[in-house]
Amino acid sequence: MRIDEERLKPYRKMTDAQRNIRSAGDPEFTQQVLDHYMLGENLKGIEVPFNAYKHRFRLKPEELTVLGGINGAGKSLLASQMILHAGEQGYKSLSISMEMSPKAQLARMNRQASLQAEPLVDSISAFGEWAKDKIYFYDQHGSVDPNTLVSIIRYAADNYGIKLVLVDSLMTMSMASDDWNGQKAVVNALANCARNLGVHVILVAHAKKGEKVTDRLDK
C-alpha cells in the first residue's frame, strides 16, 4: 500500500502532550505490575537471537536500542537477524532503511534464514510466504526528515500492528552530519515514539572510523 501525505496527515498532528493522565488504578497499570512480580522484568519483550542472552536481555516495549559501530562492523546484519528472530516469536517488524533497498534486505534475510549463500528457489518462495505478514519495509532511498520518520512509525504501528522498528541509520536523517543537536532531537523523538506506541525501536548509528577496528570510537 502506498502511503501518501493524506494518510500521514493525522499522524503528523499527534504530540507527546496527547498522552493521558491516568489513574493509579488503571487496569493496564495493574496488569503491568502483576507481570513485573510474576514474570520478572527480564522475561518481557522480544528475545534476541543468542541463547547466552535469552534470560539477560530483551528488546522491551517502549524502549530504544542504539546499535553503534564503524562501517562494516555488522550493525545492519545483526539488526536483520533480530527482525527474523522477532518474526519467529510472532512479532511484526518494520524496517526503515535509507541505505539498503527492500530487495537487498530481503536477499540478505533469505541467506540468513536458509543458511545458504545462494538460497534455492523453493526456499525463497517459502520465506516470502512466511514473512508476508511479519516483516514490512518503508520503501524509500536517500534520506528522510524526522517528522516523516515518526509519522511513518505511528502509521505502521496503528495499521499493521508493528512491534519492532529498525531505523537504519541516524546519518540518513535530513540534517548535517555535525548537527549534534539535530541528532539528539531525532534520538529523543524516537525514544518518545517508542514509549508512546509501546514498540521497540532499534537505531543504527555510525561512529567515526579509526585507523584500526580496535581504535577507540569517536562520538
Where are these predicted regions, by residue range?
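C-terminal regions of RecA-like/P-loop NTPase motor modules
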Residues: 1-16, 21-25, 29, 150, ...
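Conserved inter-motif catalytic segment of the P-loop NTP-binding fold
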Residues: 6, 31, 44, 89-185
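The Walker A/P-loop phosphate-binding site
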Residues: 16-116
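Short, basic, glycine/proline-bearing loop/turn elements
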Residues: 38-39, 65-69, 134-140, 176-177, ...
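Well-ordered alpha-helical segments embedded in enzymatic catalytic cores
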Residues: 52, 78-82, 148-152, 186-189
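Phosphate-binding/switch region of NTP-binding enzymes
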Residues: 54-56, 72, 185-219
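Generic beta-sheet signal
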Residues: 63-65, 93, 163-167, 199-203
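Active-site proximal loops enriched in glycine and acidic residues that flank catalytic Cys/His/Asp
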Residues: 69-71, 81-82, 97-100, 139-141, ...
